[in-house]
Regions:
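Catalytic core of nucleotide-sugar-dependent glycosyltransferases
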Residues: 191, 195, 204-231
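A transmembrane-helix-recognition feature enriched in membrane-embedded lipid enzymes
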Residues: 224-245
Length: 247
């Protein structure tokens, strides 16, 4: 049975962490390692992490110390990971069988990773549905990062997240691994993640963050030598608008 490492990054957001950790530790996949990277919180997070470690033993690994931000924390978690398959979770899995189904699909299809759909939620209400589908980065398509679970060897081959990006290092990383079409992904046409919307989560942001993301995204395209970068930018914007229309 392949080992799966699930990584959560957190900083002074205990209530959110409690929800997230509860969902991860309810997963029915047995060979699961849960890694929590805390940026040195002062809100009781360290005490909560110690309780998780005491309750779940070696299944839970954590570190609590200052870091260089979201992507530095994610890189730290990847380095700590001992699993064959690695992914992040800073929100909630859709149900307790998500990880089991992910592993099953990767093994059945012989791919390097898997991704699926996302629902953005506020409380009990779904405010946006994001069906990722299949596509090409040249048409503005990109896997939903919170649903992306990859074999660790992909990170070993292509490197980690670039910390000089502040908001779009995930986009740059996905361009880097997908542009030459050597990394194969399976698509699961189902909701894998419920993503907290607005103030409930650091995973979503406002229009200002979206503009910053577009700027850094264009930089990522040019640095990775993707031709017609402005066309890709336009396609990305249109895909986002269509998601809002369909919600």
């Amino acid at each position: 049975m392949q080992k799966v490492s699930v990584i959560t990054m957190t900083y002074n957001d205990l209530s959110h962490l409690e929800k997230c950790a509860g969902q991860v530790l309810k997963q029915d996949y047995e060979n699961l390692e849960y890694i929590i990277v805390d940026g040195g919180s002062t809100d009781g997070t360290k005490e909560f992490l110690a309780q998780l470690r005491e309750q779940y033993g070696e299944k839970v690994t954590y570190v609590s110390e200052p870091d260089g931000g979201l992507y530095d924390a994610l890189n730290k978690g990847i380095r700590m990971a001992t699993g064959d398959i690695v992914g992040l979770m800073c929100d909630e899995f859709a149900d307790k069988g998500v990880v089991s189904r992910m592993v099953s699909v990767i093994e059945k299809e012989g791919t390097d990773g898997v991704h699926g759909n996302i629902n953005y939620v506020s409380g009990e209400k779904v405010v946006r549905r994001w069906r990722m589908g299949k596509g090409s980065i040249r048409t503005g398509w990109m896997p939903g990062h919170p649903t992306l679970y990859l074999k660790k060897e992909v990170y070993e081959t292509y490197g980690l997240y670039k910390t000089d990006y502040k908001i779009a290092a995930d986009y740059e990383f996905m361009i880097r691994i997908l542009k030459d079409k050597k990394v194969s992904l399976s698509y699961m046409d189902e909701v894998l993640v419920h993503m907290f919307h607005g103030e409930e989560s650091a995973s979503t942001g406002g229009f200002g963050n979206y503009l910053k993301s577009l700027k850094e995204g264009h930089r990522a395209l040019t640095e990775n030598h993707v031709t017609f970068a402005w066309t890709v930018d336009f396609c990305r914007i249109m895909r986002v608008l269509l998601q809002f229309i369909k919600r």
